[in-house]
Amino acid sequence: MIKKALIFCSILWAANAMMWGQTATVKPLTIGEVRTFKSKTLHEDRTLNIYLPQGFDKTKSYPVIYLLDGSINEDFIHVSGLVQFFNEMYSMPETIVVGIANVDRKRDFTFHTDLKDLQKDFPTAGHSDKFIAFLEKELKPYIESQFKTTEKYIFGQSLGGLVTTEILLKKPEMFDNYFIISPSLWWDDESLLKQAGTLLSKSHDTKKFVYVSVGKGEHPVMVKDAEEWYDVLKKSNKKNWTVEYKMMEADNHATILHRSLYEGLVKKFPYQEPK
């Protein structure tokens, strides 16, 4: 009996030795590029996280998503995964994602306010005009010099949704598709929302896709403002604009982004049989 046990232990030891003796080849998992862009407008370096489709071909043209809050530890990884999934399972074409890493989102995503309490709570705020100029005059031309591009998208949530709304109202020609998630339209006593109808009346009726979403579990002011913003968009009667709205029943401000973008992309790109 003891002899059998010793034989079994010897076999087990030999098997373990073989297993631990095996080697594996290790190499980086690469989904794109990290670039440092020197902005003259913002007087600082900005990190760009760029997702390139599998089999990227520099001779081909691709849509581009400009993703706010696009740091590696923010939204870049999971949004790039959504884009890859929608290319595989839906009718979304292969798409480049440009994640714009934050330096100071309160500074970049808010416009000037004279409200003293906001100035106190957000001392660096109020410079979205410079950030928008950076996007328009520097970043977009740079990306278009590096890649052949087609449609342009912008994704923004919270304060990112505020500046995305500001761009749509003041410089709508900058992008073709606007995904506006939980926009912080409360900023500056809702002044942008109050101007929205007038600003929309001045914009051209060129083809656009606009998606607005908010979580049912968010602050009541966020919900009210998002619903009013959607109403203003619908009443603008832009015949060439597709305007979609989604109340995310199970989400709050912290949980909404991924599921909401999924729902927005479903509205933009219908399901197709897997390739």
What does each of the following model-derived ranges do?
Residues 19-63:
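A domain-start/cap signature at the N-terminus of enzymes
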Residues 50, 133-150:
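Conserved acidic catalytic loop of the alpha/beta-hydrolase fold
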